[in-house]
Amino acid sequence: MADRKSDEGEDEYQHKEQMVTNRTSSFQPKSTEDSISKLAKMRAADRREEFMEERASFSAVKRGYQAGDDEEDDFTAEEEPPAKKPLTVAERLMAAMGHKAGEGLGKHGQGISEPIASSTQRGRTGLGHNAGKATARDFNEVWDETTEEKTVVERVEWMTDIEEEKRAEICEQLKDDKWMVIGKEKRTIDDETKFCSQQSITEMIEAKNVFDLMSDKDLREARTRANPYETIGSAFFQNRAAMKTANMDKIYDWILSRENTENDRFLLKNPLQESQTAENVDRSEDLFYFADVCAGPGGFSEYMLWRKGFYNAKGFGFTLAGKDDFKLFKFTASSQYFFETFYGTKDNGDVMDPVNIDSLEAHISRGTSGLGVHLMMADGGFSVEGQENIQEILSKRLYLCQLLVSLCIVREGGNFFCKLFDIFTPFSVGLIYLMRVCYQSVSLHKPHTSRPANSERYITCKGLRKEFANVVKEYLKRVNRKLDELKNKKSHDDVTDLMPLDVIEADQIFMDEIIRHNEFLANRQTLYLRKYQSFAKNQGQFDKDQGNLRDECLKYWQVPNKQRPRGGDRGNRHDNMQRLNPLQVYGKYCKKVCGESEIGNTFPDFSLNCLDAPLPNIPYEEYRFVPLASSGSPNLLIAAGDSAFIFRSGRFESISADHIRIPENTILLVDWAEEVVRGDGNRIKISSEPQVVRIIDAAVLFGDDVSNLPYEERMKAAEKFVAALKQTNRKVKKGWGHRAEMIKPHLKICAKTYSLAELDEFRSNLEKLEHNRELAVLFTEGEFTFRCQALRFTRIIKQEWRMGWSKSQQKPYAHSQEHQNAGSIPVELWAEKSIYSSFWDSVICLNKDKKKLMEAMEHTKGKCPIPSSIWSWKACIRTPYGPEKILNYPEPFEGKPTIAALKAQIENTDLIVKRVRN
């Protein structure tokens, strides 16, 4: 019957198609478009007709059904049950062999009566293997989520502080090493029940053993679905370690990064919204120093540099060289140039080597002016595959050395946090006790970002006490040398105790705190190991809170909820343009619209007439100067990603970023200086070292726009910028892995600035030597000596303003003919009234501005202010004017300035305006 209806429907369809064909063939369209339109309309009409016919047929059936009685339908259903489902071919064959439903095959029905179950076998594990049974697939397995506690806010507990007398007493006992106990090395953890109950340890080990024979792939897959905090991942940093630091920083109330959280102003450095522009609110704060030990590839450091923002932090790194090295090229949240790596005397980064520890201590001391770092972070660990249960015993020396290094390099009052694993043995607990002696407060905590099924936790130490730390440091150094000696002898002996157990047990409060911590983490670890096992059995399970927890945690930790860009900034076309074109960076920050040719425009040379002005003005106070060491004019430097660009000879020249080591989005005015070294007697020569980059003015420092600040504040910011970029070692590593090489990049320093009232101080810093039958004038900046080729003057107020001197108040004020309504403005209001000149005012001279300036100089015979000018000190064979005349001639020489003439003009001005100098 069904086949017949199908045939009739097909005939009807063919009939309609034929009608359409006939209509089409008889119709003569005027054009192709008309033909297509007519066909479409006819086809639509036919479909509408078919739809109405089918709808009418369907409605008739529906009405017939609704006309019936519900009770009659029910009764009929009871009287006339539906027909049985016909047997399949397989069932008919089975019935022919005597099979009866619900029974098995065989003479006595002994065969199976249910279908063969789907396989629960995992991977290639042998049939019947215990590991296969423990994690066999079970699709009915359901995890009880009520056993977990999932929170966003974490509560940390600080251990009870030790009394001062107790600290001193313990330090006294450490001086003769009588507390150091040597015994046979240990390779079991099961019997360590002094600081955790036997039941908790046994249950944890049993839960761990389930996964010993499970493949890494299955374990990772189960963990990804089971860990409620797994999707937090690494956010926009290079790895998860960065988020651990963010997590710890927040829950410990920002003691790690030492952020000033008042009014949440610190968030202006790293806005949570991408549309908001970052602001360097810590520009005037001291530089923050930190060390990252055993922490390659560098997630801890990337977070800390990002959190501190701009150039407010300087990092030192120490980790194993090779595959576990820092991957600085993956730093995208900040610049790698604020981070300096060091690998110890043996150049291998082994933190357990006593020689390396001593060299690291000396290195950090040199890099921080002997003070040490504000924060040390340590994240050491190594593979213990197959021996996970005794990870604590295998890591004991690593524990010791990381904590020892903190005592070597952290400054007074500084902080420290370090990754630990289990702390069940007297050795580990003794170390923690000694940290309580060295630091004001100590805490043990496992953050959310540390996966709950492992034994990882962190010790956080606040407020180093040098008076006690120095004693403990020397003791732990002796312990480490003893461990090194036993290792080199391949002895089976070991240092088993750092201090007597009875001393630890006598501190009952400490014992209670350690036991409570161990019990809590052991039970929590066991719980999540069982959860992993449950999720491994049923792969359909996943933690439903992962998404919400990620969003809420990032918000609580004050970290933007965004992902790391694929391919870094090189995946963005706009960013690539900035990386390759200095004018893109220039246009981003400079408000002056100018062509590339105008960047090379120069201002008129310095003359004494620049300091001439109607009284009671004090024009000499309007200028600051720096000595120049290069024979040419200062150069504009723009750092734009992979390269830095120097403007020379009317065009930008590219310099490798690795050799200049200046972060992107930086615009500076620099003196490309050659260092001078002394030879025999009075002989001098140019150093063979790469040229030194002397910063003489700054516009943008790693995205921090300082161009509109007063000149002194710009230079102060530049000094901090240089300190953050400072290299303690002359050579740095370029590249990673087998491609790494040591290079000597250009060093950066900030030029010392002087006012004209400080001419005597400047002159006292000069040294005169005869060189090639001419006078060479040398000046010193820090550890460098340069030849003085010129002085560059910068006017610190805008062109339309003049500086006067108040006789009554004995302080300067500003006034302007163009702003007569403003009156006299005291120096305290200059920044508010935008009186200070900007970087662009004194560096970029547009053609129209230069023309206007030259006209003013001609009109006033040179007695007008100049935004910037250069006083050349170079000797010339065509004239006797040079360093000798400049320094020693008592008056202007042939109308050109000398030091004596300059001083005389300043003294005369002071006399007339009645300025009293202290």
UniProtKB/Swiss-Prot annotation:
Which Gene Ontology CC terms are recorded?
cytoplasm; nucleus
Residue stretches of biased makeup (Polar residues): 19-30
Acidic residues bias locations: 68-80
- Domain (G-patch) spans 86-132
Give the enzyme's EC designation.
Answer: 2.1.1.57
Q: Where is this region: Disordered?
A: 1-56, 62-81
The answer to whether keyword Repressor applies is no
Binding of S-adenosyl-L-methionine, residues? G298, D379
Pfam families in the cross-refs: FtsJ, G-patch
Q: Where is the composition biased (Basic and acidic residues)?
A: 1-18, 43-56
The highest taxon in the source lineage is Eukaryota
Alphabetical list of InterPro entries matching this protein: G_patch_dom, mRNA_Cap_2O-Ribose_MeTrfase, RNA_MeTrfase_FtsJ_dom, RrmJ-type_MeTrfase, SAM-dependent_MTases_sf
Instruction: Give residue ranges for domain RrmJ-type SAM-dependent 2'-O-MTase.
Output: 236-465
Q: Which residues form the active site?
A: K419 (proton acceptor)
Q: Which UniProt keywords apply?
A: Methyltransferase, mRNA capping, mRNA processing, S-adenosyl-L-methionine, Transferase
Reactions catalysed, semicolon-separated, are: a 5'-end (N(7)-methyl 5'-triphosphoguanosine)-ribonucleoside in mRNA + S-adenosyl-L-methionine = a 5'-end (N(7)-methyl 5'-triphosphoguanosine)-(2'-O-methyl-ribonucleoside) in mRNA + S-adenosyl-L-homocysteine + H(+)
Q: Which SMART domains does this UniProt record tie to the protein?
A: G_patch
Q: Name one GO molecular function term.
A: mRNA (nucleoside-2'-O-)-methyltransferase activity
Q: Name one GO biological process term.
A: methylation
- Write down the SUPFAM superfamilies for this protein, in alphabetical order: S-adenosyl-L-methionine-dependent methyltransferases
Keyword Nucleus in record: no
- What biological function has been recorded for the protein in this entry? S-adenosyl-L-methionine-dependent methyltransferase that mediates mRNA cap1 2'-O-ribose methylation to the 5'-cap structure of mRNAs. Methylates the ribose of the first nucleotide of a m(7)GpppG-capped mRNA to produce m(7)GpppNmp (cap1). Cap1 modification is linked to higher levels of translation.
Question: What is the protein name given in its UniProt record?
Answer: Cap-specific mRNA (nucleoside-2'-O-)-methyltransferase 1
Gene field = cmtr-1
